[in-house]
């Protein structure tokens, strides 16, 4: 079996561009979103909020993102919402992974020390495109070789920050589920979600700054305590993400709704075809709205697929006894142990979902450092 390498992150990002944006260019997604942002109304007649900060260019971007996220998170359809819920918890786990790596003592690069910018781009442009490129930088960093430890006060703060990170996706879904506040509140929460990674970073740094610091912060006992906090954070995130994935899969298996079947959720369809030209299951909603749902669901499907592959690659590289930067230069086949780990990761990703499998794998990896 050929070895995994950091170069494969570029292939995954390219696949993300193809699945997210190339298809969107040909299947009418861009045109439909443009129409909605110009008219400020969805095809089903609901209004689209356009004022958030009174800064024109920023409001225009937030309006576009609100239109996108609204269609995939409202209660008008079931299947696309289920998958999008799962996707957002995988990305939430990725938020935690990069936050942990940014807190290691050996990190020197500002790009890696403050990863919020990358996670904001994941929310705004597609995690399938941005996340592989950022994790490439993480894997190629020499920070783990210099000093992989995390200060105890930072590790303690991670436990609380993990809870905050896991609450982030609820900003998108709870307003629609609750049915209160209408589109105005829902779109406001979606806009807040876009900058939530910045808020989490500020919260974490602020919390870490007020926690007491030990004089012997680098002692073996302190490092052991730090490791326990990091492992606990990863296990918590993995448990929640696995529960969300199980909810998605079980819901798809037991439902009689054809819009939420397992193949409907995870198997991409249509591709270059405009969904308006394909016979769709009657739903009582305008055909143009359902075509937009199909456009965005295809986007979400490819997002999930690429992020799943990225999480397997990332966790496998970090589980390896050799550093990712070194592995990329060697032209070897994987050892039997590494091949076994890759198989386990793949199976776990199918069963537990990408967020759960990778988080548990990274918890194991943390114990090896």
Swiss-Prot record:
Keyword Transmembrane helix: yes
Predominant localisation class: membrane
GO MF annotations, alphabetized: isomerase activity
The keyword Transit peptide belongs to this UniProt entry's keyword annotation: no
Class in the EC hierarchy, top level: isomerase
Subcellular location: Membrane
GO cellular component, one term: membrane
Keywords: Isomerase, Membrane, Transmembrane, Transmembrane helix
Pathway the protein contributes to: Polyketide biosynthesis
Highest taxon of the lineage: Eukaryota
Family (UniProt): Belongs to the membrane-bound ascI terpene cyclase family.
Name of the molecule in the record: Terpene cyclase DEP1
């Amino acid at each position: 079996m050929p070895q995994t390498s950091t170069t494969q992150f570029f292939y995954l990002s390219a696949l993300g561009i193809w699945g997210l944006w190339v298809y969107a260019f040909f299947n009418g997604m861009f045109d439909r979103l443009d129409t909605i942002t110009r008219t400020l109304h969805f095809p089903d007649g609901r209004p689209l909020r356009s004022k958030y900060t009174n800064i024109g260019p920023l409001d225009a971007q937030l309006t576009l993102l609100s239109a996108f996220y609204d269609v995939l998170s409202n209660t008008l359809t079931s299947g696309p919402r289920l998958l999008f819920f799962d996707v957002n918890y995988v990305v939430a786990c990725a938020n935690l992974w990069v936050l942990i790596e940014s807190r290691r003592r050996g990190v020197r690069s500002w790009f890696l020390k403050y990863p919020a910018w990358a996670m904001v781009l994941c929310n705004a442009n597609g995690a399938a495109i941005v996340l592989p490129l950022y994790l490439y930088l993480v894997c190629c960093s020499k920070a783990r070789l210099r000093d992989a430890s995390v200060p105890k006060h930072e590790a303690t703060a991670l436990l609380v920050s993990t809870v905050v990170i896991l609450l982030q996706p609820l900003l998108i879904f709870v307003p629609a589920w609750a049915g209160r506040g209408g589109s105005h509140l829902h779109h406001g929460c979606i806009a807040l979600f876009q900058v939530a990674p910045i808020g989490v970073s500020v919260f974490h740094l602020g919390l870490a700054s007020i926690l007491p610091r030990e004089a012997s912060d680098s002692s073996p006992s302190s490092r052991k305590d730090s490791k326990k906090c990091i492992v606990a954070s990863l296990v918590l995130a993995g448990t929640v993400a696995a529960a969300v994935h199980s909810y998605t899969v079980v819901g798809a298996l037991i439902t009689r709704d054809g819009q939420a079947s397992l193949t409907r959720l995870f198997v991409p369809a249509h591709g270059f075809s405009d969904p308006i030209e394909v016979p769709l299951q009657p739903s009582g909603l305008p055909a143009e709205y359902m075509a937009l749902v199909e456009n965005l669901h295809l986007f979400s499907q490819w997002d999930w697929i690429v992020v799943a592959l990225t999480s397997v690659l990332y966790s496998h590289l970090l589980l390896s006894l050799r550093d990712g930067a070194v592995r990329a230069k060697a032209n070897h086949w994987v050892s039997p142990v590494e091949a076994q780990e890759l198989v386990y990761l793949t199976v776990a990703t199918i069963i537990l979902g990408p967020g759960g499998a990778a988080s548990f794998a990274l918890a194991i990896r943390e114990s090896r450092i």
